[in-house]
Amino acid sequence: DLRQKAKSLKDFQQQKFGLFIHWGLYAIPAGIWNGQKMEDLGSPSVAEWIQLVAKIPRSTYAKLADQFSPQSFDADKIVKMAKDAGMKYLVVTSKHHDGFALYGSAVSSFNSKQATPFKRDIIQELYDACLRHKLDFGIYYSQNIDWRDGSDGQYAVTKAQHDLVHAKTDAFGVNLWDPSENSFASYLNEKAIPQVK
């Protein structure tokens, strides 16, 4: 309903102070790949883009999931810290551009519950803690960039079509080093849409 969306947007704008958590497999290499820092590899030089900047193959990057076991993770402690600091909301990356989700999924096993030794649903735990501590909760889900399952294999076709009419093709965030074979429709209908339902 449009009125509810407008109210939610207004409420969010009035809150002004909150916590946005970027967290995923990219925290493991911490901005360094094969001894090279992000700043030396290229741009953007932010840790969550390491797979793109270092051109890490999908199968190599997926092995980081074997190391993802944040035993000190405590959703209540994080939420309480935010609340005590006067924050009004918490937003967390449920799935970033690497395609790894911090919650279980029936459509992709590349997530914290199924692909890691941690075996926990981080999103659910943070959501439940926000309810307990009366802090608004939101998620960020990268739907247009997914270096694991996105439609980056279609980039060459799109670029060739654009080149014929001298149109520019935007390659921002595109996995050109190890693209999946998925079409945009298959990625959207078989992963992105069902994963957020």
Q: Where is each model-derived feature located?
A:
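Mature catalytic domains of secreted/periplasmic carbohydrate-active enzymes
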Residues: 1-197
